[in-house]
Amino acid sequence: MLELTSEFKPSPDQQEAIKGIVKSIKKGNKYQTLLGVTGSGKTFTMANVIKELNIPTLIMSHNKSLCAQLYSEFKGFFSKNHVEYFISYYDYYQPEAYIPRTDVFIEKDSSTNEDLERLRLSATASLLSYEDVVCIASVSANYGLGNPNEYIGMVLIFELGMQISQKELLKKLVDMGYKRNDNFFDRADFRVQGDIIDIYPAYYEDEVVRLEFFGDELDAMYHYNVLENKKGKDLKRFILYPTSQFSVGETRLKQAIKDIKAELNERLAYFEHENKLVEYQRLKQRVEFDLEMLTSTGMCKGVENYARHLTGLKEGDTPYTLFDYFAIKNRKFLVIVDESHVSLPQFRGMFAGDRSRKQTLVDYGFRLPSALDNRPLMFDEFIHKNCQFLFVSATPAPLELELSKENIFHQIMRPTGLLDPLIELKDSDNQVEILFDEAKKVIQRNERVLVTVLTKKLAEELTRYYLELGIKVKYMHSDIDAIERNEIIRGLRSGAFDMLIGINLLREGLDLPEVSLIAIMDADKEGFLRSTTSLIQTMGRAARNVNGKVLLFCKKITKSMQEAMDTTNERRKLQMAYNKKYNITPTSVKRHIEESLKNEEDLGEIYRKGKKLEKMPASERAKLAKELRKQMLEAAKALEFEKAAAIRDEINKLRDL
């Protein structure tokens, strides 16, 4: 049962939208659209729709910053349910590629984020275990995963009193991808101490599962906090999932290896016939090494390129994705596409770019043709999935409107009574100086300023200029990673600085109630960043503050500017009439500032600055120990054993307190 927790109740305008959407979905309509202005509470409407339908829901967004914001909000709305997070686990990713013109092969290079990997595994585990699941996902949801039925077939179910020999259990754990590690015990590891076996599930954060045996009988089972050295909840039954969604059973693995060998022989015969000896040797060496690894360990580097064989699919079949984990046992589920006017075009372009790069790798003997089936969903496959869709946007594109037909629900009024912002036109000749004067007035009121420019270089130069004039300012563009972006947005809201300069990262979905001034530089430069949709979305960032105002710097009024101003002014009239009817006085949005995603690093800073450990709360000490443990493992991997030993001693000090 999905249970919504909130101190607020839907406004009349929200109630009407919720009622219409729920009725449309229950009637069986596949597509519907929520057209809601910025600040009208679309997220709260989405949460109420989910509660009323009470079915598993996938919420998709086009960027990681919005995913993080949605995850935080829905964790609050559905605190008693399973709210999961599924985005790419790469902090850095360079896919393998080959450039024939220069004969340059670029090896795959990546850096994975352990916490994001854990959250992905937690998402699939929850989908296979529970019905009350809300999952926030990025475009990663469209990329291939393992067969959910194979994944379920690999699970290990523990029940008190069950009989299993230690030898058999350890073999099963290894088959599931878990590694024995009696010294540096970490996620996806297990350790053995006599009749006690500790398992650290790959999708757990701080706790392990401790199994106590009497001979071959499972005598006791409970959660155990390794960092605090404390026993947790007793368990009567526990389901352990594999360490990877690509895990497969022994029978399937043997068949996959057989199929890969057959495809390899066929491809080698082709290269030999075409007298492509370099490609022949390259492919033979590479695939035979991968086969050896698969045979001995069940995994290999780049295992996803053999996904078609491992999942048992045929050439050209739709790959398994997160959607198939939702659809397990043919259950109904809802897909909400947030900021659909941006998300859907992004989904549409994914397949072509991926295919082009991989085709070159196949043609030149770096990969087997089956690697082409390790791909994202084609747009038609995505949009025709066996589920129902709700598109959400302040500016839906023609595609959403066409698909939804008459099932379009408007949400123009804000529960807070806030109006769309006032718009002022300013001469772009003196835009930097004019903005400085306007920004000072806003900052004196303890409010914030957003500035959007057209290039990274201009963002950086403008930041330097305003810093010299004494404004606390930062810039944000695509070179800044997801976690740092989150920190910058948090810093703006908390008052660490007063002005944020960006390009197109300041548009969709960012909820910044402290911002009362939006400055759009060079607003008359026609293009993607100054289209009608982009202008309306950017202006919307000022619609959460009662003093909201937008400055458009220009020399002329373009068609896009005029359309954006007309739409905004028309909405202001409707909103003013609504406020008068219901006697509403506009008030700025009040929104909690989320905790930093860098809490663990901050604790490390506190420790390094000499905060007394004995004065730290136990929960902080546990988090600090966790951070130090990561550093210890990294030092050990880098063969810096003295450093690792020193960190180990510090961890022991923490545990002794």
Curated annotation (Swiss-Prot):
GO molecular function: ATP binding; ATP hydrolysis activity; DNA binding; excinuclease ABC activity
Highest taxon in the source lineage: Bacteria
Keyword Manganese set for record: no
Acyltransferase listed as a keyword: no
Domain UVR, residue spans: 622-657
Residue ranges the record marks as coiled coil: none
InterPro entries: Helicase/UvrB_N, Helicase_ATP-bd, Helicase_C-like, P-loop_NTPase, UVR_dom, UVR_dom_sf, UvrB, UvrB_inter
Residues in Helicase ATP-binding domain copies: 23-414
SUPFAM superfamilies: C-terminal UvrC-binding domain of UvrB (SSF46600), P-loop containing nucleoside triphosphate hydrolases (SSF52540)
Cell location: Cytoplasm
Position of sequence motif Beta-hairpin: 89-112
UniProt: ATP binding residues: G36, V37, T38, G39, S40, G41, K42, T43
Function of the molecule: The UvrABC repair system catalyzes the recognition and processing of DNA lesions. A damage recognition complex composed of 2 UvrA and 2 UvrB subunits scans DNA for abnormalities. Upon binding of the UvrA(2)B(2) complex to a putative damaged site, the DNA wraps around one UvrB monomer. DNA wrap is dependent on ATP binding by UvrB and probably causes local melting of the DNA helix, facilitating insertion of UvrB beta-hairpin between the DNA strands. Then UvrB probes one DNA strand for the presence of a lesion.
HAMAP family referenced in this protein's UniProt entry, alphabetically: UvrB (MF_00204)
Domain notes: The beta-hairpin motif is involved in DNA binding.
Family listed: Belongs to the UvrB family.
NCBIfam families attached to this UniProt entry: PRK05298.1, uvrb
Assembly description: Forms a heterotetramer with UvrA during the search for lesions. Interacts with UvrC in an incision complex.
Record's protein name: UvrABC system protein B
Species name: Campylobacter jejuni (strain RM1221)
